[in-house]
Amino acid sequence: MYISNLRLQNFRNIPAKSFDFKNSINFIVGKNGSGKTSILESIYFLSHSRSFRSSQLNRIINHNADEFIIYTKAYNPDEITISLSRKKNSNNISKLNLEIQKNHTEITRNLPIQLINPESFNIINSGAQQRCKVLDWGAFYLDKTFLKIWQQTKFLVKQRNSALKQNYPYSYILSIDKKLCEFAEILDYKRHAYFTKLKPKIYEILSHFNPNLQLDIDYFRGWNLHKSLAQVLEESFNYDNKYKVTNHGPHKADIVLSVSHKPIQDIFSRGQQKLLICALKLAQGEIHNSENDNKCIYLIDDITSELDSIHTLTLFNYLKQLKSQVFITTTEKNKINEFIDTNSYILEI
């Protein structure tokens, strides 16, 4: 998959603009506020139907308009078109090859995106939910049945929490538990299948960045490995009932990062943590590319301000080896001069 043309209308501070890109590394150079990150944001929005910068639509729509439109022409290898429009207080419209979509799932499948930006480096210090999204992204593309299992599991956890809050009888909770355990086991299997591919790939890429970094990467399914979920839910019911929330289950899954059983945030420097996240994101894209025909697209925002020159060079050299389209923003062209070659494309805005 690669994007050849992107058209934006009333997206952020871009009233109307068309951009052409190459199926290689595309550098977007501009001052702060010039709109370079907005280009990455629009591509991300096309894939996810949401922004990585704001959850408020009014902030994304140009202040002089009531609607924004994003359109792209891409190849996979055949030509496809994706477009969406978002209006204030109105219905959303998403189209794939000119056909209106009931939901965004097929567009997401057709446009896999990996984002590396300053907020990405918070994955290590944020809660388990953010790290679990890493597993769910990969499993979604690896297994077409994953989404329905994930949606049903999420619904059952929500239903159980609601029943706890409303003091429903224990017999009713047990009826939910029976269904939840069934779907949770399947979800755990699919997540673990993806994790077994992800873990060695992270180690492999990390060795290119810093061969001296040592860490343990483990998968936690959300409940005791040596007990069934049914047993755990039964044993923890009084605690769950007291706090009116389900404390164990697939919604508590996590990727545990440690060094000698200590959290890596207590061991790794900030720079080492950033390298790990870069390795994780690259690993996700590589696994996707090996399992799917539509190649993952990388969006990398202002990375030169996050990594030193040596590690930036290592990252860029690694990106050049990938058969993926890459978008990289920077405020200073001189910071990327040594990375530019004949296959690169530079957009100055």
UniProtKB/Swiss-Prot annotation:
Q: Tell me the Gene Ontology biological-process terms attached to this UniProt entry.
A: DNA replication; DNA synthesis involved in DNA repair; double-strand break repair; SOS response
Q: Where does the protein end up?
A: Cytoplasm
* Binding-site residues, ATP: 30-37
State if tRNA processing is listed as a keyword.
Answer: no
HAMAP family with a match to the protein in the record = RecF
Role? The RecF protein is involved in DNA metabolism; it is required for DNA replication and normal SOS inducibility. RecF binds preferentially to single-stranded, linear DNA. It also seems to bind ATP.
Question: Mind telling me what this protein is named?
Answer: DNA replication and repair protein RecF
Which organism encodes this protein?
Answer: Francisella tularensis subsp. novicida (strain U112)
